Structure formats: C-alpha cells, structure tokens
Design a protein with these regions (language model features):
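NTP-dependent small-molecule kinase module
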Residues: 224-253, 444-513
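Short beta-strand-centered segment that lines the nucleotide-binding/catalytic pocket of NTP-utilizing
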Residues: 303-320
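ATP-dependent small-molecule kinase phosphotransfer cores
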Residues: 315-412
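P-loop (Walker A) phosphate-binding loop of NTP-binding proteins
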Residues: 284-285
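Hydrophobic positions on the alpha1 helix immediately C-terminal to the Walker A/P-loop
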Residues: 293
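Conserved NTP-donor binding/palm subdomain of two-metal-ion nucleotidyltransferases/polymerases, i.e.
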Residues: 2-56, 62-278
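A glycine- and Lys/Arg-enriched "phosphate-lid" helix/loop adjacent to the NTP-binding pocket
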Residues: 390-471
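Conserved lysine of the Walker
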Residues: 290
Length: 513
C-alpha cells in the first residue's frame, strides 16, 4: 500500500510551478494546460523540481493526436528544434532548446510522442503504454505526472533492461546509488500490487513474482548477478517490443558508443539546431572582452549543442604554410623592424612601404584565415554554431583584414612582392560572411586598465592598445547584421546581452525533419 506520509509530498496536486521556473518553461507548461493537450512528465519525477528550474532536461510525453498543436506551442514558447548530428535520434522523440535570458543558459525540452526506452544508448524497445501514463489525475509542482504505480512499474522495466549488455552495465553502474534512492521514493508512494498488475499488462508472460524479483534486485546495489538475471528474463519476454533486430541493436549500440567517445574527446555535443547553425563573429578593440565573452558563450551554448570557438586573428597553419610560418618568430628576432606591431604604427602605415618578409607573412596569414573561415562556414551549414574571436572586415587596413590597398599596390614595382600583395587582396575577396557580427565596445581608458591586469608574456602595453584602436574599430561588414554591446557593464550583464543576441540569429525549424 501507499505510504500516506510520502505520497502527498511527492504527488502534491495543489502545488504550483517553482517561483524560479524559467520563463520559457513556464510559458510552455501554462500553454499546454490552457490548451488541454494531454501530456505528463513521464520519468525521473524525483528530480522534477530541478528540471523545472532548468537544471535538468524536461521529459514530456505528449498525446500524438495533439502533435501539431504541441509544435506550435513549443515554438511560441521560444524553443528551437534540434537534431542529432550523427543520426543518433530516436523515433517519435525530439529535442528543443530555449534561452533563459535571465540566467543566460539554454533550457532543454526532451519531448516524446511514444515510449521508446530500455537501454540508455539505443532505446531499442517500443512500449505502447502511453495511455497508461497519460491517463492520470496526478500532478507534482503543477505538472501532470503518471500515477505512482505506473511510474514504479516503468522504472523497474527500464532499469531491468539496462542490465542486458556489457556497455549498459558500465553506464548504469555510474552513480548507482541514485537508482536505489529513486526506487525507494517510488516504492513509498505506490501501491505495489497495482504496480505489479500494470507490469504484467506491459510484459508478456510475466507475473507479480517476476516484478518483485526485479524490484528487489534493482534495490540492492550488491545484487549485480540478480539484476543481470532479471534483465535477461525481462528482455526475453519483451523481445516482441524490439524496434530493431538483436544484431542491429548490438551494432548500433557500439556505433553510438564510439560516437560518444569521439564527441567527448573533441569536447563537443551531438545536438545541432535543426534549421542550420550560424557563424557569430565577436569583434572589437583589444581588451573589450572578445576572448572572455566568446568562451562564456561557447560554454553556455556548448553544454547542449555543437559549438566551436575559433580565433580568426590567429588561424592555425595549413600544410602549405606550416614550415614558413614556423620560421616567422626567428625572423622577427633577427629583424626587429619586421614585427607586426611596427607596421601598426600610424607613420609606418602612412608610408605604404612594406618589406618582402612582411608581405609574405600577411599573404600566408590571409591564406590560413580563408581556409579556417571556409571550414567555419561548412560547419555552420551542417548545423554547428561557430563563435569566432575577430573576423575580417571589408575595410582595407582594418585589423584581420586585407593590409594592402590599391595605392600600395600601384607604388610597388612588378615582381614577387607585388604578386604576393595581389594574392593577399584576392584571398580576402569573396570570404564567407558571418551570420551576425557582435561589436564589443569599451572606452580606450578602460581597455588600457584591463590590459594592465592581463597576464601576458610581454606584459601590459598601453601604447599597443591605443595604437590598434582605430584599426580594430573602423571595420565595415557590408550587409551583415551588426549588433553593438557595451562591455563596460559587468561580465554577467555582458554575457546575458551576448547570449540573447546570439540565440536570436539561430533559425527556428517549424517541425522535425
């Protein structure tokens, strides 16, 4: 029987959403309630409060008959659909994300139109039990949830099927105490006999004894052998619910495991916006916060999505330029007048005189920068979000842009140097354009003060900050949208503004592909 003390605490029908529930989640759940779309938060309700506060995914099961109306509400609530970058999705399931502007973080909606579950990686089983989960009058924190009996029966079924392969055993073993804790809460809230009856309806040729055996094994962290036995028994009973053949499941499981390792090594996520990614360029004077804010934006979006952070001002060398660029530092020591900073001085720029070494360096830099930006554009076209520190403008002489104007070219005699200058100009023509430029503004005095606090090899250099000011602020980007953010505000306020502008450029897909 239900524990009368635990049940009201876990299934309080009168509770409302947490006060600090982020606005997109609040809009979504209130719209679903108003439209009377059948839905429930169908699993892991022990952590529902954390989900409603945006700390966990929100796992909603929705009546498939309301699919079209649900998609409309999802988008009206500010969510944008995402898909797996490596074909690791599941049928009848989709992901969507919205920006919590107050917290500068992404919220994750994990929506189901059908119950596909079982193992953690492939979710190889399809159980037609949606009605048993949706037909409930129970609520928790203002959100519909299954009855305690349905949630207990489903939890035991899910956990048993997670003990049927070596990979699954390794995954479920991590933090297994949380499984035991959740089971204890569910047992206290549910009528075990009613849960066993549901289990017997869902699992062919089973009985209450099988349910109780599985429940006891799952509740004992030391009973690994019993859990494996229970899992294999359950798997044999529900093989008719497999959505894939046994061999296909094994192959797919290890394919996905390999991709998980690959993404972990690259420190990337598998999800991408369904309607394509974007290249978001951060530009501005030195010490305006480009690297700091770019890193924060990458971590904010990269917690859930495939996000790349690249430094266009310092592109990696390509095969063609690797050896000559490796010799540049030595050449600068031998010829101090060839340092980049020397050519940034107003009098040197006004002279229009450039050495062959400098022209060669600028041409190689243009070549490497173009190669990097083409890779960025390709990644964005495939759905990745690319955040760049700096970006070439259309203004000759601006930082990270073409250094040689037509006057300099005309003043140079025909030969290798002029040919390289022409190549440099050509490399900057027709570059892939960013989807959005965010120009970070700061006063010269504050930029100098910030530079003094930075730990750098050559130490603070106020003259360099002021010298580069014009070069870093005069760039024009043609028809590309440019948003300006004043970074004199606190870091937290700047991150909020940056995340809002960056998220706005991601296009929302109307429905899953």
């Amino acid at each position: 029987m239900r524990d009368n003390e635990t049940y009201p605490k876990t299934m309080d029908r009168d509770a409302n959403l947490p006060v600090d529930c982020p606005q997109p989640f609040r809009l979504l759940l209130e719209a679903l309630k108003e439209s009377r779309i059948r839905h429930c938060h169908w699993k892991s309700n022990i952590r529902l409060e954390e989900s409603l506060r945006g700390k966990e995914d929100l796992d909603l099961l929705v009546d498939r008959a309301e699919e079209e109306a649900f998609y409309q509400i999802v988008q009206q609530s500010g969510f944008k659909l995402a898909q797996s970058a490596s074909n690791c999705g599941h049928p009848g399931v989709f992901h969507a994300f919205a920006l919590d502007e107050a917290g500068a973080r992404l919220l994750h909606l994990h929506a189901y139109f059908q119950v596909v579950t079982g193992d953690s990686v492939v979710k190889a089983y399809r159980f037609p039990i949606e009605a048993d989960l949706l037909d409930s009058n129970c609520q928790k924190l203002g959100v519909p949830v299954p009855t305690p009996e349905a949630e207990l029966a489903l939890f035991v079924l899910r956990m048993a099927l997670k003990h049927t392969s070596v990979l699954e055993l390794a995954l479920v073993a991590r933090g297994y105490q949380s499984v035991v804790d959740e089971l204890m809460v569910l047992q206290a809230a549910a009528d075990r006999d009613a849960a066993a009856a549901l289990w017997c309806r869902w699992v062919p040729d089973s009985n209450p004894e099988m349910f109780n055996d599985a429940l006891r094994a799952i509740g004992d962290p030391r009973a690994l052998g019993q859990r494996i036995t229970a899992g294999l028994r359950v798997a044999s009973r529900v093989r008719g619910n497999r959505r894939m053949g046994a061999l296909a499941v094994i192959v797919e499981r290890w394919r996905r495991a390999g991709l998980m390792v690959h993404h972990r090594l690259l420190d990337r996520r598998n999800a991408r916006p369904m309607d394509g990614g974007a290249v978001i360029a951060l530009v501005g004077p030195k010490a305006s916060g480009k690297s700091t804010l770019g890193g924060r934006l990458t971590r904010t979006f990269g917690r859930h999505l495939d996000v790349r952070h690249v430094h266009v001002g310092k592109p990696p060398a390509t095969l063609l330029t690797m050896l000559p660029r490796a010799a540049i530092p030595l050449a600068r020591k031998v010829f101090p007048g060839e340092r980049s900073g020397e050519y940034e001085k107003p009098e040197r720029r006004a002279s229009g005189s450039y050495s062959l070494l400098h022209v060669l360096n600028m041409t190689m830099l243009a070549y490497d920068r173009r190669a990097l930006l083409k890779r960025c554009a390709a990644a964005a076209a495939s759905g990745a979000i690319v955040v760049t520190d700096r970006y070439p403008s259309k203004t000759v002489g601006a930082i990270d842009s073409s250094r040689f104007d037509d006057a300099s070219l005309s003043a140079c005699r025909p030969g290798l140097k002029r040919w390289l200058m022409e190549r440099e100009q050509a490399l900057y023509r027709g570059l892939p354009e960013p989807d959005l430029v965010i120009r970070l503004n700061v006063t010269p005095a504050l930029a100098v003060a910030r530079d003094e606090q930075r730990v750098k090899e050559d130490g603070p250099d106020a003259s360099a900050v002021l010298r580069r000011w014009e070069m870093e602020t005069l760039g024009s980007f043609g028809d590309v949208p440019v948003v300006e953010i004043d970074t004199r505000a606190s870091l937290g306020e700047s991150v909020v503004l940056l995340a809002k502008e960056a998220w706005a450029v991601i296009r929302p897909a109307m429905t899953p592909a």
